[in-house]
Amino acid sequence: KAAPLYDRQLRDLKAADYQQVIDAMVEKGLSRSSCEKQRTLFSQICEWAMAQDIINKNYAMLLQLPAATGKAERTLTAQEIEQISSRQNDPKFGQTAQIAMVLLYTGMRIDELLSMRCEDVHLKERYMQGGEKTEAGKNRIIPILEPIYKIIAFWMLDSGCEWLIPSKAGTKLDKRNVATKFRALMQECHIEGVHPHTLRHTASSKMVECGLEKTAVQAILGHKNFSTTANKYVSHNDPAYLLQEMQKMKY
């Protein structure tokens, strides 16, 4: 689970690095118990490193875990979404707020958005095509709704390279850095108990609440059970149809 840290020096690791592992576990659907065990392991490593004078702080004590099992998974309220939206033009938090809004209006995973290439964005037809490399998730149609159209259009004009949201160096944005900025944005908005994956869950919950057809929701989100029925519902791979369904979604 901590594979991204294997090649790093222990003295260089900070709370954000350990949090990245926890966040990845949450995105994969692992339980709070699994996350607690991973945090305990990180804590033991930090305690050993402190005893060896390698570091001077137990960074594991700063990690945020998902809600306890048995509680309903967290979704953002309309007021919290407005708090995020209001910071889209902020010099410090603007890009992160824009990323959050796109995730809220597409249901994409953060990795999927950061991996999006400009060539896969079709502004005229109002959809993107991408997703994780799974049978149901890869190369799926992701409609672009009006509230995020200008964000996507700006990113396309501003990119200057293959990535839709590149770093200043023209490379793919680092998920760890984005996650760190996301936590800072949540603190700025006084929003607690939220991870990037919460945005996907909020979007999927809103789609269901607003009455989108079940197979359309599955297609847009790339749910694994959609791959077994996709061939029976050819229309659900049609960008115009999926956009029409997504337009039912209102926050």
Show which residues each predicted segment covers.
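Basic/aromatic-enriched alpha-helical hairpins
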Residues: K1-G29, I45-E47
